A protein has these predicted regions:
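Conserved helix-adjacent loop modules within structured domains
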Residues: 1-119, 125-130, 134
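Active-site- and interface-proximal helix/loop "cap" or "latch" segments in soluble metabolic
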Residues: 124-204
């Protein structure tokens, strides 16, 4: 985690080593300290398979619910044979998963319902002109009041992080342009800024 003081702009990083429990890897969730960690921890789980203990919604965020494996792990099978595009509808679930360790150190799952019986749910997207991109939001409303929003991301995710591992820096620039057609230059500028900072390059 990278934490920043919004007044002084001081930054500090907090690193946590994942603990292995059987064949799974776990770290404590910080969602109760910082609510912004919600989607970030789900993204780590989706791509790397690390379960965040105490997070109330450890579902996939970018990949399909029936996707097998964790694509940013070094041992992930990248062969086309193991990653055929499914031709079936994506299975839906009305439950979330929360993982914790019991008194004997075993990983146990607790399930929570997404919606109450009297909830009114509006599916916003995945194709809607106001989103300016492919995005689905399961929106729980009470009259004109939005009670909760469950985002479904990744409809145009291409695994660019994995592709960039075998590219030179100049080769990656064309990929960042395709992240979002509305702000292609912003993504390229962000990547170039990180590369320059890592190389110690000062612009004049």
């Amino acid at each position: 985690y990278i934490l920043e003081n919004t007044q002084t702009h001081e930054r500090t990083s907090v690193k946590q080593l994942a603990k292995q429990v059987g064949e799974e890897y776990v770290v404590p969730s910080v969602i109760r300290l910082w609510a912004d960690a919600d989607l970030l921890e789900r993204e780590v789980f989706d791509f790397l398979g690390i379960k965040f203990l105490g997070h109330p919604d450890m579902r996939r965020l970018f990949m399909r619910n029936d996707f097998t494996g964790y694509p940013l792990r070094k041992d992930f099978d990248m062969s086309p044979e193991a990653n055929r595009f499914p031709m079936t509808d994506e299975p839906e679930t009305d439950w979330t998963s929360e993982w914790n360790l019991d008194d004997e150190g075993r990983l146990v799952e607790t399930r929570h319902r997404l919606f109450d019986e009297d909830d009114f749910v509006i599916n916003f997207g995945p194709n809607h002109p106001s989103t300016h991109g492919v995005l689905r939001l399961q929106t729980v409303v009470d009259g004109e009041t939005i009670k909760h929003v469950y985002p479904h991301l990744g409809y145009i995710h291409r695994g660019m992080e994995k592709m960039m591992e075998s590219m030179t820096y100049p080769q990656t620039l064309a990929l960042t342009d395709r992240l979002n057609y509305l702000c292609a230059m912003h993504h390229r500028h962000a990547l170039v800024g990180v590369i320059e900072e890592a190389m110690g390059v000062e612009l004049t």
